[in-house]
Amino acid sequence: MRNSKDSYFFEDIVVESNSFQDSNKYINVESNILDLEIKGEYTLAKIRDAFAFHFQKYNSLGTKEIMAPVADFSFDMLVKDMKVISEVFIPELWVEPNSKISGRYFTDLALLDFNLNSPGIEYKQNILEAIDLKYFSSEQSSKITFDIFYASLANGLQIDSLILANQLRGDSLFFDFNCAIRDSIRSDIDLLGYAVKSPEQGYNFGLRESSFNIGEEDFFFNDKNLIHIDTGGVYIEDLILYGDGEKILVNGNI
């Protein structure tokens, strides 16, 4: 393999497949870069559509609806050494060895179960360490949880123990987000709330039992508030921030 500056040489890449059959297919790839196994009843287009069908739930505004494909498959990938791939195709990306991706898809209930575990990923000087992501979704609901031990952003911001859990039911998303930010002082953030697609092709957000601190000062949000976002901007209703014996009430358009 060659890019504009250098040549790269691979060790043996072993590919085993019976993909000409109509069902019970498998493809197995072994190399010094990664190992990959896909098996079941599938085509590459159906694998793409299985992910697209579920991810469209989170951003379906103005896009063509994708139907759940008829397929049943599982997949496993182990990253060994991505140095050559990164240097040739995406120099800004680095994936640590022993990163694992696995999952399965079933036609029944359009069930997608997806897991990602990685010691670390770096992209454009943004670094994530010890990543554990789980995604479980059916036609009725979806749940995502991820836990990142440490994040260092290109702007110098450092984040410890970033944890997110959310569940999507119909057009309503419920989320619980926690992290600790290290700058000149430490700030702990705890956000609990919801997001709902509105009939006006926008989103309604609300915070519940949410708080954060800046140094020794603690701040809290009221439970009854509304933030509406659409193409026309942002509308805020009854958002109150309490702290240090004072409060700030926000109402209006941004």
Residue ranges of predicted features:
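Interface amphipathic segments
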Residues: 1-254
